């Protein structure tokens, strides 16, 4: 059966017309091999590696396989040795029948690169069949007046073997009336003819029995016999005559059993028994006798067995008509079997790989062959796959197709494809065959890990415990398997002074970040670093993200009082004039807090006072002011305890103790800088010496009285100075800009210092006093000098 295949592109369809055996995809030659039939399974045919000129082991490395046209595995390839072996006993007669030579066509498929080699195997015949006559006895009715030399064709014997192993000669048993003549027939066949050598005489011998022997040409020769019985008849001078020498008819292959194929008819002009014609098959094969039957009286030929166009597409039937007198005639009936679309297309997969790397464009996945046993339009096929798939069907040779990837695949978009290969014929009705294959896309490392965020901000409260989990980073990889396994690491910091290795660590498997030591907000408020995420593919891909760590302040620092100093030294007394108005600024408590935010928000509160209600502390700036007018009944000395508290949780606090002294006639003295006071005191001492000399000269007349009076006055004034607390206010202005500090936690106005002296060798300390106000600045130098002189003289000593 000749199969033509038509394929043309339509969407994903591939249609191709095979008009002849094409050229191999690899441009290879045509291999011809042979083997004797009936050889045992596993018999050696050829070494393909040597025959194809391939290196040892190349057949196995390239996945070489053998594919037969009818998908039957007659041959087996040992890819390691390269030997091509028979996979079963080959019977030439079953494979090819009488056809000679008997050829089996197959293909050799190899990958990397893909190649197809066409080859054929000839099955050589052996003489394993003896000739066989279909009829064990043949009856010939011969009239006694038959002329000498008349030939009577006999039915030939059947021998499945071919060539020299087929029938080569016929013989007849010895007799005095007949001999055998060999005549040629169609398709190179020989037929025996029985030739009359001597006239018959019915009255002398009415019947003869001869043995016909058929001999083949094998070695040793095989033979078969049949009996020829000759009946001598009276004279019958007219033989039957067929209306046609050749009857041609057609029968669809799906015709039912009993279907009338054709009716033959022969006429005999004799009369009586000599005119009675009977019909029979003549020299018919076993296949014809089992497929058809003939009515011996009417000449009607009926279908005895279903037809199959794909097995036999035509029959040649020899019909013999014989009259009652033994005369016969022959005709031939040619039956053409009409093909119907009763065979769906066949799809035979020769090789298939269910996995393909995602970065492998135009990679062969499957090699398959399509076939339709029908003919004509019924045998034309359309082959296609679904639309919108990244695959192509590429036609090869001899009905072969290759399924390849159209381009690079992306496993992250789609990891599995279910492909349906559909083969449809063009018959009516159309028949189709579907073959489903599943292709898995294997992963390659083409995606770097991706962090869930480009930057991370982590918060950790100071004074944390070491190894505290402070946060995590996370990265995902769209690949799979080891290509998606992510390892985290710390990258070298951009700031070379940042001791990152001693601050944080990262879990390489899950990205958890840990603080290695306790953090101190006051030392390090924030820092940043980069983390890397690397997969385990080859080559490895990585990506990095920025991590910012903000240290949150904890209330771990208590307020610290800057003024007045609380260092355990002798307390410094603040002077408050009794004439001060309500709200008069006595002093200011200055404190700071090492924390930040609300932990450093300070508030002030008067905790204890000698006389409650006399003084008040402003909560937000620590200023100590008078709450009411002072009176003579108020005590001269006062002790205040001020509580300084931050706004943390829990709050921390500190206390400051203030000593206040209420004085009369004290306005707003200026205090010089502590370091300037000794020089000015020295100048005043020198001036006092001059005054003393002048005084002594002026009162020389009153020497004794003056001395006594002077000593008495000095002693009196020293006693008064001791009762004031031995505090002296140096003369001279104090530069306000040196202590003008802005801010909620420090001084907001200009203050002066006060030097406090003890009764010892002269150790002193300084502290802030009341602000310098404008009425003091309005006083002239003379007034200041007078007041300072008065102040010095009233206390009775100079500051050194």
UniProtKB/Swiss-Prot annotation:
Signal peptide segment: 1-26
Protein name: Protocadherin beta-10
A GO molecular-function descriptor: calcium ion binding
Keywords for this protein: Calcium, Cell adhesion, Cell membrane, Glycoprotein, Membrane, Repeat, Signal, Transmembrane, Transmembrane helix
Protein's GO biological process: calcium-dependent cell-cell adhesion via plasma membrane cell adhesion molecules; cell adhesion; chemical synaptic transmission; homophilic cell adhesion via plasma membrane adhesion molecules; synapse assembly
Subcellular location(s) per record: Cell membrane
Gene of this entry: PCDHB10
Disulphide bonds in the chain: none
């Amino acid at each position: 059966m000749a199969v033509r295949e038509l394929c043309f592109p339509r969407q994903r369809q591939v249609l191709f017309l095979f008009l002849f055996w094409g050229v191999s995809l690899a441009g290879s030659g045509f291999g011809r091999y042979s083997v004797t039939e009936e050889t045992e399974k596993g018999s050696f045919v050829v070494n393909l590696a040597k025959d194809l000129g391939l290196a040892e082991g190349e057949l196995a490395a390239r996945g070489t396989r053998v594919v037969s046209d009818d998908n039957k595995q007659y041959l087996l390839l040992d890819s390691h040795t390269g030997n091509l072996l028979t996979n079963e006993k080959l019977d030439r007669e079953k494979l090819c029948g009488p056809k000679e030579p008997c050829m089996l066509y197959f293909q050799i498929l190899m990958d990397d690169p893909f190649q197809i080699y066409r080859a054929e195997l000839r099955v050589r015949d052996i003489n394993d069949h003896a000739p066989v006559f279909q009829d064990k006895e043949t009856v010939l009715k011969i009239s006694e007046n038959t002329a000498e030399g008349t030939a009577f064709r006999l039915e030939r014997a059947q021998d499945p073997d071919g060539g020299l192993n087929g029938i080569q000669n016929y013989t007849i048993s010895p007799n005095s009336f007949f001999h055998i003549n060999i005549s040629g027939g169609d398709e190179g066949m020989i037929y025996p003819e029985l030739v009359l050598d001597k006239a018959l005489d019915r009255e002398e011998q009415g019947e003869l029995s001869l043995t016909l022997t058929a001999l083949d040409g094998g070695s040793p020769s095989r033979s078969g016999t049949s009996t020829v019985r000759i009946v001598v008849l009276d004279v019958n001078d007219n033989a039957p005559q067929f209306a046609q020498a050749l009857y041609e008819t057609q029968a669809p292959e799906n015709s039912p059993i009993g279907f009338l194929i054709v009716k033959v008819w022969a006429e005999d002009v004799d009369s009586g028994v000599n005119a009675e014609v009977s019909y029979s098959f003549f020299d018919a094969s076993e296949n014809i006798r089992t497929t058809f039957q003939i009515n011996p009286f009417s000449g009607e030929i009926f279908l005895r067995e279903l037809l199959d166009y794909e097995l036999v597409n035509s029959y040649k039937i020899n019909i013999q008509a014989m009259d009652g007198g033994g005369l016969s005639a022959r005709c031939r009936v040619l039956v053409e079997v009409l093909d119907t679309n009763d065979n769906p297309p066949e799809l035979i997969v020769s090789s298939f790989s269910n996995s393909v790397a995602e970065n492998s464009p135009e990679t062969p996945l499957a090699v398959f062959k399509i076939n339709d046993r029908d003919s004509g339009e019924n045998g034309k096929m359309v082959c296609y796959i679904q639309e919108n798939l990244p695959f192509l069907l590429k036609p090869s040779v001899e009905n072969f197709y290759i399924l390849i990837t159209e381009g690079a695949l992306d496993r992250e978009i789609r990891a599995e494809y279910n492909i349906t290969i559909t083969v449809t014929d063009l018959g009516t009705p159309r028949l189709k065959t579907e073959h489903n294959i599943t292709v898995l896309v294997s992963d390659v490392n083409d995606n770097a890990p991706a962090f869930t965020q480009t930057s991370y901000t982590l918060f950790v409260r100071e004074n944390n415990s070491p190894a505290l989990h402070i946060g995590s980073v996370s990265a995902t990889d769209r690949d799979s398997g080891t290509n998606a396994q992510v390892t985290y690491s710390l990258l070298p910091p951009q700031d070379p002074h940042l001791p990152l290795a001693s601050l944080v660590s990262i879990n390489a498997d899950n990205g958890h970040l840990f603080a290695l030591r306790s953090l101190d907000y006051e030392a390090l408020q924030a820092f940043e670093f980069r983390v890397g995420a690397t997969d385990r593919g080859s080559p490895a891909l990585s990506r990095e993200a920025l991590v910012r760590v903000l240290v949150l302040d904890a209330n771990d620092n208590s307020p610290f009082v800057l003024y007045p100093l609380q260092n355990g030294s002798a307390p410094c007394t603040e002077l408050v004039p009794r004439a001060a108005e309500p709200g008069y600024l006595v002093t200011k408590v200055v404190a700071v807090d090492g924390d930040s935010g609300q932990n450093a928000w300070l508030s002030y509160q008067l905790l204890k006072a000698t006389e409650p209600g006399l003084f008040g502390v402003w909560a937000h700036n620590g200023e100590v002011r008078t709450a009411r007018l002072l009176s003579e009944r108020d005590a001269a000395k006062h002790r205040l305890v001020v509580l300084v508290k931050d706004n943390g949780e829990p709050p921390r606090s500190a206390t400051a103790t203030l000593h206040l002294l209420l004085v009369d006639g004290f306005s707003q003295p200026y205090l010089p800088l502590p370091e300037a006071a000794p020089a000015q005191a020295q100048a005043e001492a020198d001036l006092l010496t001059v005054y003393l000399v002048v005084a002594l000269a002026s009162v020389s007349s009153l020497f004794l009285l003056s001395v006594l009076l002077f000593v008495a006055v000095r002693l009196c004034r020293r006693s008064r100075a001791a009762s004031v607390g031995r505090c002296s206010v140096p003369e001279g202005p104090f530069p306000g800009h040196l202590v003008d500090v802005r801010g909620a936690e420090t001084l907001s106005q200009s203050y002066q210092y006060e030097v406090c002296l003890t009764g010892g060798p002269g150790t002193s300390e300084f502290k802030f006093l009341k602000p310098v106000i404008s009425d003091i600045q309005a006083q002239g130098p003379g007034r200041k000098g007078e007041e300072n002189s008065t102040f010095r003289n009233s206390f009775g000593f100079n500051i050194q």
